Amino acid sequence: MNTFSQVWVFSDTPSRLPELMNGAQALANQINTFVLNDADGAQAIQLGANHVWKLNGKPDDRMIEDYASVMADTIRQHGADGLVLLPNTRRGKLLAAKLGYRLKAAVSNDASTVSVQDGKATVKHMVYGGLAIGEERIATPYAVLTISSGTFDAAQPDASRTGETHTVEWQAPAVAITRTATQARQSNSVDLDKARLVVSVGRGIGSKENIALAEQLCKAIGAELACSRPVAENEKWMEHERYVGISNLMLKPELYLAVGISGQIQHMVGANASQTIFAINKDKNAPIFQYADYGIVGDAVKILPALTAALAR
């Protein structure tokens, strides 16, 4: 048996749902999708869900992951085994841990490939900071996986599909975190994993102000702007949602233009599936040139304006 009888899908990020649903179609005979509202439920059915389970009744001061208890109860009530697919977001991983505990299931994070043999999941993912690929065969009846972006192609919606809709009512967990306040933050409104062209900056750009040079290039060629982890996490020059690497975005654009990025393996794991890699770096020995199809050795601050002017003609 090379499929599970049932798969359960949930995504806290709507843009990740289509790829999770495509993976679900390949891995199981029946697809169940947990959603938070009617609109997401309708989308899930169009993407292939046989059953939609609307999570309902959570108080405003409670967290989405506190649905884990009723989600686990629902999963157990409808089968003695099954596969759970979640995005590898922070909330996805937290929910995976809670579901794994309640289902007595093995949990595997950041899966890059998933296959099923004899009713058991085999998962591959990066280990040792991207230096190797680890393979795990999950023996527990339930398997809970968080999936890296780009592992599956996105499912295409079909408005003619039909499915059944159910409601799962909120039950307060015995121990919970209560939200006392919220603070809005600037976040990435662009789905970088869908971008055809990406310009990505590293610390070699020199300063936060110099990122404007990369933004001008993006505008000239219709690209989206990304960055390396140090730019987002250490320097705080750009939003967390824009950094490319093993622990965040895994991209497959037609063109990845790396500006001032050294090319460490942890970053390149997220970029080396690009069709073409173009690198700009003043260090001729930078590892990025081992991955690049094309490269320029020089100061990005001088090269970017000239490149933008040439491509804008």
Curated annotation (Swiss-Prot):
Residues binding FAD, per UniProt: 255-283
GO biological process: carnitine metabolic process; fatty acid beta-oxidation using acyl-CoA dehydrogenase
A Pfam family it matches: ETF_alpha
Keywords: Electron transport, FAD, Flavoprotein, Transport
Top-level taxonomic group: Bacteria
PROSITE patterns (alphabetical): ETF_ALPHA (PS00696)
Pathway membership: Amine and polyamine metabolism; carnitine metabolism
GO molecular function, one term: flavin adenine dinucleotide binding
SUPFAM superfamilies named among the record's database cross-references: Adenine nucleotide alpha hydrolases-like, DHS-like NAD/FAD-binding domain
Xref: InterPro entries: DHS-like_NAD/FAD-binding_dom (IPR029035), ETF_a/b_N (IPR014730), ETF_a/FixB (IPR001308), ETF_asu_C (IPR014731), ETF_asu_C_CS (IPR018206), FixB (IPR023461), Rossmann-like_a/b/a_fold (IPR014729)
Record's signal peptide: none
Keyword Transport: yes
Matches recorded under NCBIfam families: PRK03363.1
Protein family (similarity comment): Belongs to the ETF alpha-subunit/FixB family.
Cited function: Required for anaerobic carnitine reduction. May bring reductant to CaiA.
Subunit field text: Heterodimer of FixA and FixB.
Protein name: Protein FixB
Species of provenance: Shigella dysenteriae serotype 1 (strain Sd197)
Name of the coding gene: fixB
